[in-house]
Amino acid sequence: MEEQTTQSAADGQTAIELVTGPISDALKARGLPHELTGLDNRKIEIIKVEPEHLIAVARALYDDGFNYLACQCGFDEGPGDSLGSMYHLTKLSDSADRPPEVRIKVFLPRDNPRVPSVYWIWKTADWQERESFDMYGIIYEGHPNLIRILMPEDWVGWPMRKDYVTPDFYELQDAY
């Protein structure tokens, strides 16, 4: 649960408002460790999960009907800071006008960014996790085919990291 601070322009006083959400509450009722970090501008819950608890939380959300991994991506908090893996889940059904959504964030140490793969829960994670591996160097443990997907196989480094130094020259091997 997060406290969001708002300040009234009229009197200059600060009010503290507690942020909760039904998805976070359901995870809490199951005893699954997580932290609700807030809501985005569309009131979608953003939940922080430690890597060792990701699979348990992901399975619980899948069991609760979050059957679609709309997006998975890696991100970099900045040079010297942590890397992360983000999962945007949707509960799709035939009659849903505005289906529930949730965003999970997992923060990883820069020097050893490892997190379990959710491929075995949502198959749409396949190429998305491969892209995060290719661009950020995040290792998705248990992924069936974790190889580069965009960069040449012999590329050195992780091009989307904020501390990446672009090489002055790279020679492509001729396929013929």
UniProtKB/Swiss-Prot annotation:
Keyword Transmembrane in record: no
UniProt entry keywords in alphabetical sequence: Cell inner membrane, Cell membrane, Membrane, NAD, NADP, Plastoquinone, Quinone, Translocase, Transport
Gene Ontology cellular component annotations, sorted alphabetically: plasma membrane
Subcellular location as annotated: Cell inner membrane
Principal EC category: translocase
Signal peptide: none
GO biological process: one example: photosynthesis, light reaction
Reported function: NDH-1 shuttles electrons from an unknown electron donor, via FMN and iron-sulfur (Fe-S) centers, to quinones in the respiratory and/or the photosynthetic chain. The immediate electron acceptor for the enzyme in this species is believed to be plastoquinone. Couples the redox reaction to proton translocation, and thus conserves the redox energy in a proton gradient. Cyanobacterial NDH-1 also plays a role in inorganic carbon-concentration.
NCBIfam families in the record: PRK12494.1
Subunit structure: NDH-1 can be composed of about 15 different subunits; different subcomplexes with different compositions have been identified which probably have different functions.
Similarity comment: family membership: Belongs to the complex I 30 kDa subunit family.
Protein's recorded name: NAD(P)H-quinone oxidoreductase subunit J
Organism: Gloeobacter violaceus (strain ATCC 29082 / PCC 7421)
Lineage: Bacteria, Bacillati, Cyanobacteriota, Cyanophyceae, Gloeobacterales
